C-alpha cells in the first residue's frame, strides 16, 4: 500500500529514480502528529490579530530587508529561492557558503545561540540540481528584533571566518 501523504520521517530516500519509504508504522505517519492543535487554536488566532499591527509589520519589514541585504552583500554566501523584487516579503533564507560544510556552520551557530535548519531540506534532487550537499535555512518571525537580526549576521560572519 502506498502512502497518500508524504513528508517528515515517513521517507527514507527521495531521488529521481524513486522513493523509499520508512518501515511501518512510520510509512503512514507523514509529518509530526498534530495533537497540540486544539489548545493552541485560541493563542494562534490572537497572534494573527496582533500581526495586523502597523508597527509590527514595519519591524518585520525592517528585519527582513536588513537580513536579505546583509546576506546578499556577502560574496561568500549563496542565497537560494528569493525571487527578485520579493526581498522584503520573505522571512526564510536558504543559503550555503562555498567551501564550508553546512553542518559545521550550523553547529557553530548553535553554540552561539542561533538555531538554523541544516541539511537537504527533504529536497535531495534540488540539492543535486544546485550542486550542493546541503544548505542552511534561517527563519525570522514577527517577534524577532533588529538586535537579533544584527546578532545573526555578525555571528554568521564570525562562524564563516572560523571555517574559511
Question: For each predicted feature, which ranges?
Answer:
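Pyridoxal 5′-phosphate
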Residues: 1-164
Amino acid at each position: 500500500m502506498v502512502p497518500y501523504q508524504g513528508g517528515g520521517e515517513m521517507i527514507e530516500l527521495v531521488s529521481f529514480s524513486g522513493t523509499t519509504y520508512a518501515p511501518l508504522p512510520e510509512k503512514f505517519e507523514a509529518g509530526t502528529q498534530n495533537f497540540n492543535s486544539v489548545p493552541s487554536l485560541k493563542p494562534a488566532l490572537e497572534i494573527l490579530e496582533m500581526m495586523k499591527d502597523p508597527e509590527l509589520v514595519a519591524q518585520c519589514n525592517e528585519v527582513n530587508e536588513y537580513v536579505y541585504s546583509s546576506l546578499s552583500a556577502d560574496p561568500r554566501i549563496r542565497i537560494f529561492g528569493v525571487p527578485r523584487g520579493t526581498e522584503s516579503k520573505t522571512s526564510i533564507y536558504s543559503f550555503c557558503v562555498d567551501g564550508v560544510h553546512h553542518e559545521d556552520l550550523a553547529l557553530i551557530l548553535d553554540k552561539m545561540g542561533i538555531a538554523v535548519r541544516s541539511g537537504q531540506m527533504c529536497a535531495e534532487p534540488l540539492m543535486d540540481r544546485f550542486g550542493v550537499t546541503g544548505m542552511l535555512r534561517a527563519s525570522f518571525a514577527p517577534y524577532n528584533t533588529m538586535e537579533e537580526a544584527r546578532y545573526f549576521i555578525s555571528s554568521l560572519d564570525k562562524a564563516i571566518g572560523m571555517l574559511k
